[in-house]
Amino acid sequence: MQQIMLMCRPGFETEAGQELMDSAAACGLFGYFQPIRNAGLVRFTLGGPESAFELMQRIPLDELVFVRDWFLVIGDCPLPARDRVGAVIEFLRGADWQGSLASRLETRLTETNEDRDLGNFARKWVAPLSRGLREADMLAQDSASAKGDRLELLLLDFETAVVGLSLADNRSPFPQGIPRLRLPASAPSRSALKLEEAWKVFIPEDRYLDYLGGGRKAVDLGAAPGGWTWQLVQQGMMVTAVDNGPMNPELMATGHVEHVRADGYAWRPKRAVDWMVCDIVDKPRKTARLALDWVGGKLCRYTVFNLKLPMKKRYEEWLICRDILLQGLAEAELNCRLRARHLYHDREEITCFIERLD
């Protein structure tokens, strides 16, 4: 297998392809990418003797920012109007597919798919296709024998399926990298979902209490009307909301929030807190330096902040901000972990997470 299918936010295909091309080159692997414009899909093809599997063994998905999820591409399978199950079986036989490689399959759609009939077909097709593949020894009979690797079928339309394999230890825990979240009626704004998604992406599920529990203290810079503050309060935190704008009255009535009318970039706490979060729309380098000031000054242990990218050279701007952050953390001689991801609930921004490990 020489090709990988990348999934990203529609409109950011070039950034995702460039990012993987640079990451591969850093490992001594070279290839090229073909974006499927405004579909949130990119085909990345290795140009040398190395396999796509080798590339995925060297590059953890967690280290990528614009790539939400990916899988190894076996090939494009034409789907006839009749007996599509048989067509997939014959395609896999022709590709020398080993049934022990995967124990289950998933059907995928492009994020921009608006064909309800295709969506209904994708859901209903899983059971008969799985049954047919197992009967043909194209799927392992039990999950233990396949180590959790999964056969993927990305339906571009009713005529074509991109068939591939996702690796259990290097794929998103969420379908196509998108957590399915619902906005409670009590949340002041939809931005609440962004912070929730950030926690799900950056924090191991079995360590939620370690990071978020125990009555922690937090600061929300640029808080109004209170979407991120609301999420912090839901975790039982005492929150200082810093913003010159008005906060949601119901949120203030919880007794967990102190509203400070001040400039989020200038204000600093008298004592260190556990969390600092910031969703201020401003120049990304300014926000990156703000986060460095908080972490470097040991004003917080954890921070989640957004970097608003420009309309042009978005990937290049992220690289500049990344270097600012990494260099600043190194100069502060702090043991920290930096992660970033273009979340589903992000638009023209990316979300960063820094935690102090000392």
UniProtKB/Swiss-Prot annotation:
Domain of life: Bacteria
Spans through the membrane: none
Catalysis performed (reactions): cytidine(2498) in 23S rRNA + S-adenosyl-L-methionine = 2'-O-methylcytidine(2498) in 23S rRNA + S-adenosyl-L-homocysteine + H(+)
Record's subcellular location: Cytoplasm
Gene Ontology CC, one term: cytoplasm
Chain residues that bind S-adenosyl-L-methionine: S191, A224, P225, G226, G227, D243, D263, D279
Keywords in alphabetical order: Cytoplasm, Methyltransferase, rRNA processing, S-adenosyl-L-methionine, Transferase
GO BP terms: methylation; rRNA processing
Gene3D superfamilies with a match to the protein in the record: 3.30.2300.20, 3.30.70.2810, Vaccinia Virus protein VP39
InterPro entries for this protein: RlmM_FDX, RlmM_THUMP-like, RNA_MeTrfase_FtsJ_dom, rRNA_MeTrfase_M, SAM-dependent_MTases_sf
Active site annotation, chain numbering: K308
SUPFAM superfamilies the UniProt entry points to: S-adenosyl-L-methionine-dependent methyltransferases
EC number(s) reported in the record: 2.1.1.186
Entry's Gene Ontology molecular function annotations: S-adenosylmethionine-dependent methyltransferase activity
PANTHER family: RIBOSOMAL RNA LARGE SUBUNIT METHYLTRANSFERASE M, RIBOSOMAL RNA METHYLTRANSFERASE FTSJ DOMAIN-CONTAINING PROTEIN
HAMAP family: 23SrRNA_methyltr_M (MF_01551)
Assembly, per entry: Monomer.
Function: Catalyzes the 2'-O-methylation at nucleotide C2498 in 23S rRNA.
Family: Belongs to the class I-like SAM-binding methyltransferase superfamily. RNA methyltransferase RlmE family. RlmM subfamily.
Name of this protein: Ribosomal RNA large subunit methyltransferase M
Organism per entry: Marinobacter nauticus (strain ATCC 700491 / DSM 11845 / VT8) (Marinobacter aquaeolei)
Top-level taxonomy: Bacteria, Pseudomonadati, Pseudomonadota, Gammaproteobacteria, Pseudomonadales
Gene responsible for this protein: rlmM
